[in-house]
Amino acid sequence: MENISDLWNSALKELEKKVSKPSYETWLKSTTAHNLKKDVLTITAPNEFARDWLESHYSELISETLYDLTGAKLAIRFIIPQSQAEEEIDLPPSKPNAAQDDSNHLPQSMLNPKYTFDTFVIGSGNRFAHAASLAVAEAPAKAYNPLFIYGGVGLGKTHLMHAIGHYVIEHNPNAKVVYLSSEKFTNEFINSIRDNKAVDFRNKYRNVDVLLIDDIQFLAGKEQTQEEFFHTFNALHEESKQIVISSDRPPKEIPTLEDRLRSRFEWGLITDITPPDLETRIAILRKKAKAEGLDIPNEVMLYIANQIDSNIRELEGALIRVVAYSSLINKDINADLAAEALKDIIPNSKPKIISIYDIQKAVGDVYQVKLEDFKAKKRTKSVAFPRQIAMYLSRELTDSSLPKIGEEFGGRDHTTVIHAHEKISKLLKTDTQLQKQVEEINDILK
């Protein structure tokens, strides 16, 4: 059979004819052939989402295409780059049971390669937590010990913990770094008691340089596990080993947490992560799009960022959903398509976020005024009056301050905005024609 790279390139040429251009560009173009073993062709996808999408939507089509090219029935398997090492020919172990031995740090699969300081987007809601995490990574057990990070789901706590682990290992390859969830700690502890291996369990977690333990709130109510973790904490702290803990709430709010554990969690630094603001959400989307090789218009990223303000996971998930929807219906990505793609996951009760630009555009459409005229020095009634209406609506429909509104209207003073608001408010009480025009503008903005 021909070289697998040549075979796959031939298959791609055929697949390009069978699927839409957006589908090919999004899902197939960036794939490569990894290997061919025992009638199984392994294809490398650029990321996890693409791998899953290819498996569920294109496996059959790819198999048929390869059959047409080779006359052989090949099974298709998709992998992502970091899992390729698992597919290589197994080498003899350097010593018996090497696979079961504890290594100096966790396997690559345990520390997510995507979760580094370089890929973390810094914003007002996580700036302090990021700085504290970096300080801990640069000087384990010398800056803040323990470091306790808390915040809601999907805000970046786990990302920072993995980033600390990666940084420590990169700068000290011999460091013993362990990351695990409190649930895993609990399960291993229970199993160690059952199997009479308590000593092995203690040695495993009390002889590390950095312990990263996620979701510590799950220890609540587990008295024996809390007892074990208390002694593990003490053993590490006394040896000046770094401990990093995450939770969905601060120590004082974790129910049924022993006071002695709570006090130890408060020995070091407690920092929180809050939901990202609009600017940070846009930056997160841009970084995600760049990482996935996606070309997303700015208006679409702004729309998604305005609609999804809960956490980073949902934000990135919304972006991928829009890309997938675009591919399925074979249409270019724009704000309207994004709205259609996300209609099922955006609560109906969530009000539309209206910007001053939106208001200027709507008023301009109704009164035939160019956008640039709202910021110009023109004082003719045909421009000045619509400008006052736009200022009035900006005050009513946005959270912008008076100076901010004035700035968006050519740098006018805030007193000008106040005057416009008072004037239009007064006219609306008696002028029925103006009432209808403002109602029309509101309809456009809905």
From Swiss-Prot:
<feature type="region of interest" description="Domain II">
    <location>
        <begin position="93"/>
        <end position="109"/>
    </location>
</feature>
<dbReference type="GO" id="GO:0005524">
    <property type="term" value="F:ATP binding"/>
</dbReference>
<feature type="region of interest" description="Domain I, interacts with DnaA modulators">
    <location>
        <begin position="1"/>
        <end position="92"/>
    </location>
</feature>
<keyword id="KW-0238">DNA-binding</keyword>
<comment type="function">
    <text>Plays an essential role in the initiation and regulation of chromosomal replication. ATP-DnaA binds to the origin of replication (oriC) to initiate formation of the DNA replication initiation complex once per cell cycle. Binds the DnaA box (a 9 base pair repeat at the origin) and separates the double-stranded (ds)DNA. Forms a right-handed helical filament on oriC DNA; dsDNA binds to the exterior of the filament while single-stranded (ss)DNA is stabiized in the filament's interior.</text>
</comment>
<dbReference type="InterPro" id="IPR013159">
    <property type="entry name" value="DnaA_C"/>
</dbReference>
<comment type="subunit">
    <text>Oligomerizes as a right-handed, spiral filament on DNA at oriC.</text>
</comment>
<feature type="binding site">
    <location>
        <position position="156"/>
    </location>
    <ligand>
        <name>ATP</name>
    </ligand>
</feature>
<keyword id="KW-0446">Lipid-binding</keyword>
<feature type="binding site">
    <location>
        <position position="157"/>
    </location>
    <ligand>
        <name>ATP</name>
    </ligand>
</feature>
<dbReference type="InterPro" id="IPR001957">
    <property type="entry name" value="Chromosome_initiator_DnaA"/>
</dbReference>
<dbReference type="InterPro" id="IPR024633">
    <property type="entry name" value="DnaA_N_dom"/>
</dbReference>
<dbReference type="Pfam" id="PF08299">
    <property type="entry name" value="Bac_DnaA_C"/>
</dbReference>
<dbReference type="InterPro" id="IPR020591">
    <property type="entry name" value="Chromosome_initiator_DnaA-like"/>
</dbReference>
<feature type="region of interest" description="Domain III, AAA+ region">
    <location>
        <begin position="110"/>
        <end position="326"/>
    </location>
</feature>
<dbReference type="Pfam" id="PF11638">
    <property type="entry name" value="DnaA_N"/>
</dbReference>
<dbReference type="GO" id="GO:0005737">
    <property type="term" value="C:cytoplasm"/>
</dbReference>
<feature type="region of interest" description="Domain IV, binds dsDNA">
    <location>
        <begin position="327"/>
        <end position="446"/>
    </location>
</feature>
<comment type="similarity">
    <text>Belongs to the DnaA family.</text>
</comment>
<dbReference type="GO" id="GO:0008289">
    <property type="term" value="F:lipid binding"/>
</dbReference>
<dbReference type="GO" id="GO:0003688">
    <property type="term" value="F:DNA replication origin binding"/>
</dbReference>
<dbReference type="GO" id="GO:0006270">
    <property type="term" value="P:DNA replication initiation"/>
</dbReference>
<dbReference type="Pfam" id="PF00308">
    <property type="entry name" value="Bac_DnaA"/>
</dbReference>
<keyword id="KW-0067">ATP-binding</keyword>
<dbReference type="InterPro" id="IPR018312">
    <property type="entry name" value="Chromosome_initiator_DnaA_CS"/>
</dbReference>
<dbReference type="InterPro" id="IPR003593">
    <property type="entry name" value="AAA+_ATPase"/>
</dbReference>
<dbReference type="GO" id="GO:0006275">
    <property type="term" value="P:regulation of DNA replication"/>
</dbReference>
<keyword id="KW-0963">Cytoplasm</keyword>
<dbReference type="GO" id="GO:0005886">
    <property type="term" value="C:plasma membrane"/>
</dbReference>
<dbReference type="InterPro" id="IPR038454">
    <property type="entry name" value="DnaA_N_sf"/>
</dbReference>
<keyword id="KW-0547">Nucleotide-binding</keyword>
<feature type="binding site">
    <location>
        <position position="158"/>
    </location>
    <ligand>
        <name>ATP</name>
    </ligand>
</feature>
<dbReference type="InterPro" id="IPR010921">
    <property type="entry name" value="Trp_repressor/repl_initiator"/>
</dbReference>
<feature type="binding site">
    <location>
        <position position="154"/>
    </location>
    <ligand>
        <name>ATP</name>
    </ligand>
</feature>
<dbReference type="GO" id="GO:0016887">
    <property type="term" value="F:ATP hydrolysis activity"/>
</dbReference>
<keyword id="KW-0235">DNA replication</keyword>
<dbReference type="InterPro" id="IPR013317">
    <property type="entry name" value="DnaA_dom"/>
</dbReference>
<protein>
    <recommendedName>
        <fullName>Chromosomal replication initiator protein DnaA</fullName>
    </recommendedName>
</protein>
<dbReference type="InterPro" id="IPR027417">
    <property type="entry name" value="P-loop_NTPase"/>
</dbReference>
